[in-house]
Amino acid sequence: MSDQIYDSVHADLDPFKKILNVIPGFKGYVERQARRDSDKLLREMVSSRFEEQWQRISALQRDLISQGDIALIDDLEGPAIKIRTFADRIRRATRGYSSLFEAVKINEAELTQLYQYDAKLLDLAGEVARAVDNVETSIGSDGLQAAIRNLRSVAQQCIEVFDRREEIFTSAPQTPA
C-alpha cells in the first residue's frame, strides 16, 4: 500500500520537475519531497480509518445513554480518547515525521522497516474495527466488560506501534509487534 501511494505521488511530477531531476542534488530533493507527500497521504488514510472507529464508539456511547446505561460511558471513554488521540497524532505529525527524510540518510532496510510499520498501522485499524464490533454485539451481555478491556488494549497497542515507528531512525532495528 505504501509503495502504491509513493509511486502515485512520484508519477505525478510535472515536466519541469522531471527536467530538474538531471540537476545534481535536485533529484534527492525531489525524492525526499515525494516521500514526504506519500507519507502524508498514508497518514491521512490511516487517520481517517481510526476516526471512523472513534465515531462508532461515540455512537455506542450515545446509544448507551439513551438506554440508561450511563455507568458504561466512562468505561468506553478511555479507549475512545486513546483512539481519537492516536488518529490526531497520525494526522498532525510533521510531514516526513520531523524531517525524517532530510536529517537521516535512509537505507533500503530502514525503508522496508518503515513500510512494515505502515502496514501494521493499517492492520491495527482492522483490529480496532473488530474490537468495536465486539463491544457493539456485547452490549446487554456479560461479555461487555471483556469487550471494552479488549478495545482498550488494542487502542494502547496502536499508540505503542506508532511510537516504535517514530524510533526507526534513532534506535536499533526492530520489527512491528
Language-model features and meaning:
Residues 2, 51, 81, 149, ...:
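A broad, low-amplitude sensor of folded, mature protein cores
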Residues 53-150:
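Charged linear interaction tracts used for macromolecular binding and regulation
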Residues 138-177:
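Preference for long, well-ordered alpha-helical segments
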Residues 9, 22, 30, 46, ...:
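Extended aliphatic helical segments
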Residues 27-44, 80-82, 111, 118, ...:
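Residue-level signal for functionally critical sites in structured catalytic/ligand-binding pockets
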Residues 1-61, 65:
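Leu/Val/Ala/Ile-rich N-terminal alpha-helices, chiefly Sec-type signal peptides and the beginnings
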